[in-house]
From Swiss-Prot:
Binds 2 Mg(2+) ion per subunit. The gene is ruvC. The lineage of its organism: Bacteria, Pseudomonadati, Thermodesulfobacteriota, Desulfuromonadia, Geobacterales. This is Crossover junction endodeoxyribonuclease RuvC. It comes from Geobacter metallireducens (strain ATCC 53774 / DSM 7210 / GS-15). GO terms for biological process: DNA recombination; DNA repair. It catalyses: Endonucleolytic cleavage at a junction such as a reciprocal single-stranded crossover between two homologous DNA duplexes (Holliday junction). GO terms for molecular function: crossover junction DNA endonuclease activity; DNA binding; magnesium ion binding.
Length: 164
């Protein structure tokens, strides 16, 4: 299963692609989509959407996982962040991908084993789990963590579905 993890942001949206092969997690790619702060906000959202459509077309993931974000510095930031998440989710749905959402606490729990882990602990664990030579850029590292969370959670979700 190939998973595209997303760390949404109105200025920088991080993405990370991993492949689950048996019990192993394999790093495929990661990066960030940057938007121009000087451009109209609608055009920035369009850039996020188009950038993720390109990533999806190139890497053909089986699923998308997006981090839910609850904290923002102010109401305006929260609204912009929500809109960036929406652009990312629509890119996934537009490509026919199942989209799952995870809270930061769920991601930390899945990656580190502790829901209140520090950002550095999550980054170090992502580096270790994916056998990366160095810690990825912050937004991309967060996106890889979301992908790891989904890859590890998807198996459990399938088991629970089969029980019902």
């Amino acid at each position: 299963m190939r998973v595209l993890g997303i760390d949404p942001g109105s200025r920088i949206t991080g993405y990370g692609i991993i492949e689950k092969v048996g019990n192993r997690l394999v790093h495929v790619d990661n990066g960030a989509i940057h938007t121009d702060n000087h451009k109209e906000f609608a055009l920035r959202l369009h850039r996020i959407f188009e950038g993720l459509c390109e990533v999806i077309a190139e890497y053909r993931p089986d699923a998308m996982a997006v981090e839910q974000v609850f904290l923002a510095h102010n109401a305006q930031s929260a609204l912009k962040l929500g809109q960036a998440r929406g652009a990312a989710i629509v890119a996934g749905v537009n490509a026919g991908l199942p989209v799952s959402e995870y809270t930061a606490m769920q991601v930390k729990q899945a990656v580190v084993g502790y829901g209140h882990a520090r950002k550095e602990q999550v980054q170090q664990m992502v580096k270790s789990l994916l056998n990366l030579p160095e810690i990825a850029q912050a937004d991309a590292s967060d996106a890889l963590a979301v992908a790891v969370c989904h890859a590890n959670s998807a198996g459990m979700k399938n088991i629970l579905r089969s029980i019902r």
